């Protein structure tokens, strides 16, 4: 990263589309001989919204549509023209979940054609409760659903690291509910790093 880098100097698809696209292309080429589930979408630097706090819902959703279209095109060019044969996922965490559903003024990404065949990774609320589960109408999504669940959290406004704060019966209850609601494609657990004694 830097002025002389082929990836540009900003983690911004809005101001550095060419650099970010080169970064993604090189990553796809570098890893194409391995078994992968490709992560779709984009967040801002340091786990922030893609456009920052001042941007509107519509601005964010429209930029994410461009991101998804670019990513799918890169996958077709470098991995396989048939996207149905390429495992892909998009994590709907914090602000990305809001962009997925949209609001009363802005249609979100819920029925976005670029997400067809992409596993939609739902998440918990950082305290062990699922933020959302797919409605009956949503369960027909071609890519299915997955879960990204925190057993360790480092971030504002609180952090719980290196301690077992997830009550195991609650974990069982939440994951059982998720499974019964069709969240069965991919499960990822954030367990943090290894603490030393």
Regions found by a protein language model. Name each.
Residues 2-25, 142-148, 168:
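Active-site-adjacent "subsite" loops/lids of carbohydrate-active enzymes
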Residues 14-142:
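Gly/Pro-rich turn-and-neighbor structural signature
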Residues 12, 102-103, 107, 166-169, ...:
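General structural signal for secondary-structure boundaries
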Residues 122-128, 135, 139-197:
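Structured mid-domain segments that build the active-site/substrate or prosthetic-cofactor binding neighborhood
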Residues 1-2, 126:
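Contiguous N-terminal and early-domain "leader" segments and peripheral loops that mark the onset or edge
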Residues 5-9, 47-58, 152-164:
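Glycine- and acidic
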């Amino acid at each position: 990263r830097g002025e002389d880098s082929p990836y540009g100097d900003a983690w911004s698809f809005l101001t550095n589309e060419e650099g970010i696209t080169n970064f993604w292309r090189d990553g796809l080429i570098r890893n194409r001989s391995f078994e992968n589930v490709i992560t779709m979408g984009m967040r801002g630097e340091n786990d922030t919204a893609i456009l920052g706090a001042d941007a509107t819902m519509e601005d964010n959703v429209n930029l994410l549509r461009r991101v998804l279209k670019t990513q799918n095109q890169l996958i077709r060019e470098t991995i396989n023209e048939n996207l149905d044969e390429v495992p892909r996922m998009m994590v709907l965490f914090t602000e990305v979940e809001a962009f997925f559903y949209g609001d009363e003024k802005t249609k979100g990404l819920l029925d976005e054609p670029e997400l067809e065949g992409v596993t939609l990774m739902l998440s918990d609320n950082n305290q062990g409760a699922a933020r959302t589960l797919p409605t009956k109408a949503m369960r027909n999504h071609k890519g299915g659903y997955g879960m990204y669940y925190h057993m360790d959290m480092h971030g504002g406004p609180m952090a719980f690291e290196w301690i077992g704060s997830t009550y195991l019966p609650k974990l069982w209850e939440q994951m059982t509910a998720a499974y019964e609601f069709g969240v069965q494609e991919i499960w990822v657990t954030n367990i943090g790093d290894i603490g030393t004694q």
